[in-house]
Amino acid sequence: MAPLWIDIAKKEIGNKEITGGKDNPRILEYHSTTLLKAKHDEVPWCSAFVNWVISQTGLKGTGSASARSWLKWGKGIAEPAVGAITVIWRTSPKSREGHVGFYLGPDPNDKSRILVLGGNQKDRVSIASYETSRVLGYRWPSVNEAV
């Protein structure tokens, strides 16, 4: 059985950035859960999405707009379970850039990849495939994340 936050995240699939001078109010709501509190939907928002989803369950997220902030949240787990917060490197494993989303399982089309439900994946909430070699860590809530 998937954790509650996966059900919440799945209901957000399809929310996307608005091109031009307007902003998607839902993405701005995601941003409101971080200290950055960005005012535009073009500002990277993968961590904001994870913070928002986690907050909907009554847990406390990182409050950071940085994807890599999740590497210090909860407890690390060696083997991912559905719903595990998954932190992925972007430019290089040592860069500060990253991506974060929720682990859904192995990619059925390529066993060297995983499926991640996340925000700001091609400017929308979606399910995307990532190479497992790019995973920096899988995280799970601990008692410290209770609000």
Report residues per predicted region.
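Intrinsically disordered, low-complexity, charged/polar segments
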Residues: 127-147
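Helix N-terminus capping/helix-initiation residues
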Residues: 24-25, 66, 131
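...with weaker cross-activation on analogous glycine-rich loops/strands in unrelated enzymes
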Residues: 2, 59-126
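A residue-level signal for beta-strand positions that form part of recognition/binding surfaces
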Residues: 6, 113-114, 135
